[in-house]
């Protein structure tokens, strides 16, 4: 394979769905999150976790691949790099989760471990568990962009 490939796929993962979000984010303003204060408005905040009910859920995955790397990006969960594998050594070089089980670590509540997430303006950013917009492009030189 001389060129990189990019494709959209569906990935089934065991998932613990988020419970309902706080309908009045004003009441979450005093929830301190790792030294950053509240004020989530206009975003709703998840204040609980679900540990009882697990479902199988399909996620849209952007799959990028060349002869050396195999990378999965989850745009539905903040655009995080969900998995990245070195094809030469068959080694996952980031921790790869095999279940989506949110904890209350994110700025708006839900957050998952594993992979790599873009963190701005601070760690476990507010949109880390929200869907993100994305585009894919196949370039003339054989590279791909997501």
Put a short name on every predicted segment.
Residues 12-15, 74-81, 98-102:
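A short, sequence-level motif marking secondary-structure junctions
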Residues 88-108:
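Active-site-surrounding "flap" and adjacent substrate/cofactor-binding loops of secreted or lumenal enzymes
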Residues 1-20:
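Intrinsically disordered, low-structural-confidence terminal and linker regions
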Residues 64-67, 86:
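Active-site beta-strand termini and strand-to-loop segments that position acidic
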Residues 6-10, 108-119:
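Short N-terminal helix-initiation segments at or just after the protein's N-terminus
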Residues 6, 62, 71, 82, ...:
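A broad, low-specificity signal marking well-ordered, structured residues that form hydrophobic/aromatic
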Residues 69-72, 78-82, 89-92:
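Primarily extracytoplasmic ectodomains and periplasmic/lumenal surface modules that are beta-strand-rich
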């Amino acid at each position: 394979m001389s060129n990189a490939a990019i494709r959209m796929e569906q990935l089934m993962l065991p998932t613990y769905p988020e419970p309902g979000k706080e309908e009045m984010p004003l009441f979450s303003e005093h929830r301190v999150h790792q030294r950053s204060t509240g004020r989530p408005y206009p975003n709703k905040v998840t204040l609980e976790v679900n540990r009882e009910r697990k479902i199988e859920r399909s996620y849209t995955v952007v799959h990028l691949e060349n002869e050396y790397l195999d990378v999965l990006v989850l745009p539905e969960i903040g655009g995080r790099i969900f998995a990245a594998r070195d094809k030469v050594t068959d080694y996952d070089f980031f921790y790869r989760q095999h279940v989506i089980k949110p904890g209350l670590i994110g700025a708006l509540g839900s957050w998952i471990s594993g992979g790599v997430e873009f963190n701005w303006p601070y760690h476990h950013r507010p949109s880390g568990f929200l869907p993100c917009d994305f585009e894919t492009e196949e370039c003339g030189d054989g590279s791909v962009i997501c």
